[in-house]
Amino acid sequence: MKGLRINMYYGDETKDLNSKLLIFIRMNISKKDLLRINQGFGGNLRSSSSLDFVFERIDTGKIGPYRKLAHLIRAILVDHPFSDGNKRTAMFVAFAFAKEYNKAIDRDLLLHHIISIASKNIQIIRNIEWRLKNAIK
């Protein structure tokens, strides 16, 4: 992840992923955080039902971090809750996850998987989790 820079625009201020990662502490992300991330990519919320469901699901302590990430990525890429920036938001969430857990990312493979999940509407969580584990080690 050295040299990786993702800049997001928040009003008059640009925040950098490397200098300040504000949302992930052991998958402690809120819907409000996710909406703010997506707004940084120029999107707006279209439908909140899928996000409400996924946050209810990942708040239980019974599933592991990759499974939680898979649920969140699925909700973003398959259900398209935002008007724009769904894939960029999913990519940011994956980078933030890797940063929090000190994991290495195969960026090209992760991008391939994100595009594949979105274009093929892959809904099987186990399959999404496997893809994420492949790209984030």
PLM features: residue spans?
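FIC/Doc superfamily catalytic core
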Residues: 1-137
